[in-house]
Amino acid sequence: MDFYDITNFLTYLSPIILFGGVVLGSCYFSKIDILYKIIVYYLFGMLAIDISARVYGEIYGSNLLFIPILGFMELLAFFCFYFYSGILESRKKSVFLGTIFLLSSAFMAWEFTSISNNATLEGFQSYSKVISTFLIVMLAIDFFISKILSSKNIAPQLFFLNSVIIMYFSMVLIIFIPIDFLINDAT
């Protein structure tokens, strides 16, 4: 077994872990809070996108079309997550973040249509994924700040989950920022 076989095998861990999370979340779905239900929906959406992207990539040779879809689904899930967590208490903040969400969604829709018209590596840009990931990190940081400044107690599990969200999406951001330069180094 060489390095290629090992890395190819490791790519199958993602749907396996997502499937496990969906099954586990489904077993406890009626007993969990709305925030954790959103996470289960998120895992299900990511599993559907993962499987669809693999099948589409095998059939058409490129699954770049799914990058903006992935970014939109992540942004939608975590916007809902933080909406229900209570960080949008003020009307100003709700309007501001709602406007950013709508503008980002419009950009992702535009990027989706431009990629679907020309899904080649040479013209690929991962801006929608970078934008959605950056906004999720900002929402998570805003969650920390608003909970620290408020006098309300926060459940330790929610605090831990928010920390994991920040760490995961910060790593994704670090990975996706240079992708444009790696793919399009001649531009």
Which residues make up each language-model segment?
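Terminal, non-globular segments
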Residues: D2-T187
